Swiss-Prot record:
It is found in: Nucleus; Cytoplasm. Component of the CCR4-NOT complex, at least composed of CRR4 and CAF1 proteins. It comes from Arabidopsis thaliana. PANTHER family: CCR4-NOT TRANSCRIPTION COMPLEX SUBUNIT (PTHR10797). A divalent metal cation binds at residues 42, 44, 172, 244. This is Probable CCR4-associated factor 1 homolog 11.
Amino acid sequence: MIKSEADLSDVIVIRDVWAYNLESEFDLIRGIVEDYPFISMDTEFPGVIYKADLDVLRRGNPNYLYNLLKSNVDALSLIQVGLTLSDADGNLPDLGGQKNRRYIWEFNFRDFDVERDPHAPDSIELLRRHGIDFERNRREGVESERFAELMMSSGLICNESVSWVTFHSAYDFGYLVKILTRRQLPVALREFLGLLRAFFGDRVYDVKHIMRFCEQRLYGGLDRVARSLEVNRAVGKCHQAGSDSLLTWQAFQRMRDLYFVEDGAEKHAGVLYGLEVF
């Protein structure tokens, strides 16, 4: 299924990826990543089943937060990955087709079984309300092992030419590292950050971290930050990984153009919100 919605003169199309079209969609991505080296990413997963101690959370403790992340990611499974590829000017790929149609991707995974696997019920209900069909994912979704194999050869990772743009992405990267390594996350935060750099490079931008350094006071989740920056959602719904990956990219673009024209955002790269180790 392909969903689209007009954004000014362009129509943004979300390419839904299932098991049957996984390889052909990665073929498309492999062919364009050199020209569209900015990759914005979002994931959907079944919430968290291990909760943070609020007092520790307020004080900020990267090692504690990583241990909590590891406990949740090790126990849970990925539901969706959204990818938006762009060039430095913000142009999305047209894939050689109609010039007013631009494309982003949403990968649907089969790993999570809502009837069997641990999850946070309120998170599952939220995702259902926003259109995720867990039964279809189980029937037709992508196997994470095959996704990882194709990602390794896609040019998206282990590639010094690409930049990754995310929002509050420690969990997002946690799930990707888990499926890429096919094992539980490492015990030590520094080892996890080493794997993050090995796979995704040094140019990883977490908008939730970077917005601390903007002149305008920005706070809250992705939708609130986007509204503060006067960025509108171009396609899809919140809590859908493809749509959120595009909104993340557009918020980053606006933030970069407003606050980091002279003093670039590069010096804030490589740090994930909540896991700040300097």
